[in-house]
């Protein structure tokens, strides 16, 4: 077996997947190279071609298959891996006693929203122990913005007897810096929640491989 392939695998077993570079992770996924190109070289070529791991994971079938060394089989495997990750995060949130750890909500929102090509506004509804009741993509917009109606969020929260909410939306541009309208919306949502006794936990803006948390900003 190709030693170049084994090196990332051995590194993963010794130090965990988080110790691997994007190139090494992709090499494990690809398993083998192509004629005249070892798998580590191929994985770097693929990353260079797409610009980032995120762009690779977000590519449609036609774009994906235009890259040398990639085909329909790899595309199917990648989509299945992405979906398993989403479901794992959702199930983690369902079985945990609460969502007191901010990173868990962030990871779930990133998995759901990072690859969206238009703005999507999503809400997590929690009970009084911060356990997830449900999560829902409530508003869809254009590449620049999504129109959000606080009253609809409150109506849904009351309908499912939520004691708290966490909201998030993505910036398709990749820049997670909140706009003035994002800040204004956050204030409106906080006020609307306060009026009906629902706790507003956080508003998270999802970018490319990064995020902004209004709650975390208070402690900076």
Curated annotation (Swiss-Prot):
CDD domains to which the protein is assigned, alphabetical: MPN_DUF2466 (cd08071)
Family: Belongs to the UPF0758 family.
Keyword Hydrolase annotated: yes
Residues that hold Zn(2+) according to the record: 169, 171, 182
PANTHER family, per the entry: DNA REPAIR PROTEIN RADC, UPF0758 PROTEIN YEES-RELATED
InterPro entries tied to this protein: MPN (IPR037518), RadC_JAB (IPR025657), RuvA_2-like (IPR010994), UPF0758 (IPR001405), UPF0758_CS (IPR020891), UPF0758_N (IPR046778)
Short motif JAMM motif, span: 169-182
Domain MPN: 98-220
Pfam families: RadC (PF04002), UPF0758_N (PF20582)
Keyword presence, Zinc: yes
Keywords from the named record: Hydrolase, Metal-binding, Metalloprotease, Protease, Zinc
Protein name: UPF0758 protein APL_1970
